[in-house]
Amino acid sequence: MATPGFPSTEQRLGLYPVVDSLLWIERLLAAGVTTLQLRIKNADDAQVEQDIVAAIELGKRYQARLFINDYWQLAVKHGAYGVHLGQEDLEAADLAAIQQAGLRLGISTHDEHELAVAKTLRPSYIALGHIFPTQTKQMPSSPQGLASLSRQVKNTPDYPTVAIGGISIERVPHVLATGVGSVAVVSAITLASDWQRATAQLLHLIEGKELADEK
């Protein structure tokens, strides 16, 4: 049985960093990022809950859209803004409980079939990926490319869309040209030689925020 639909979010979420630590959440909120995701891997349960609680508090303090990856029970328990789930997590998660708690839901998709499945669940946004090759995580699927992204965006007018996977600063203009509403990045910020500068450039490209004058 389909869920009755999840709370809506902005049609264009803008820059959407996906990070793995509370430190990065703090840094990026202070840098002006308003949509972000905490994706914790390989941590013990007590530390995970502690970090999620702290991240949710920070998100509320900055009035940001903070999504918790995977740990939907903790997100519900502590009143997160939203949850992000991969396709492999959908069957195990209690989607009705997430919806009844008033949390937003984002869902990952990797092809047309998964996109169709996501639409039946009426989430708050749909992530489309991976667009380019990525070293951030092992992917069983092949990169979709810009042509596929453009087609999927056009076929998904009723949902905010997020492009993810191997998106560098240089690739952002081409990704935005597809009409996608948000661009998720990982290593473009976390592996940058100057993460603050990289974040400012991405905010400028994606959201039109002014860059500080060069000295």
Swiss-Prot record:
GO CC annotations, alphabetized: cytoplasm
Residues the entry annotates as binding Mg(2+): D70, D89
Key words, A-Z: Magnesium, Metal-binding, Thiamine biosynthesis, Transferase
Binding positions for 2-[(2R,5Z)-2-carboxy-4-methylthiazol-5(2H)-ylidene]ethyl phosphate per the UniProt entry: T134, Q135, T136, G166, V186, S187
UniProt-listed InterPro entries: Aldolase_TIM, ThiamineP_synth_sf, ThiamineP_synth_TenI, TMP_synthase
Highest rank taxon of the organism: Bacteria
Co-factor binding details: Binds 1 Mg(2+) ion per subunit.
Gene3D superfamilies: Aldolase class I
Biological pathway: Cofactor biosynthesis; thiamine diphosphate biosynthesis; thiamine phosphate from 4-amino-2-methyl-5-diphosphomethylpyrimidine and 4-methyl-5-(2-phosphoethyl)-thiazole: step 1/1
Pfam families per UniProt: TMP-TENI (PF02581)
GO terms of biological process kind: thiamine biosynthetic process; thiamine diphosphate biosynthetic process
Catalytic activity: 2-[(2R,5Z)-2-carboxy-4-methylthiazol-5(2H)-ylidene]ethyl phosphate + 4-amino-2-methyl-5-(diphosphooxymethyl)pyrimidine + 2 H(+) = thiamine phosphate + CO2 + diphosphate; 2-(2-carboxy-4-methylthiazol-5-yl)ethyl phosphate + 4-amino-2-methyl-5-(diphosphooxymethyl)pyrimidine + 2 H(+) = thiamine phosphate + CO2 + diphosphate; 4-methyl-5-(2-phosphooxyethyl)-thiazole + 4-amino-2-methyl-5-(diphosphooxymethyl)pyrimidine + H(+) = thiamine phosphate + diphosphate
Family: Belongs to the thiamine-phosphate synthase family.
Function comment: Condenses 4-methyl-5-(beta-hydroxyethyl)thiazole monophosphate (THZ-P) and 2-methyl-4-amino-5-hydroxymethyl pyrimidine pyrophosphate (HMP-PP) to form thiamine monophosphate (TMP).
Protein name as it appears in the record: Thiamine-phosphate synthase
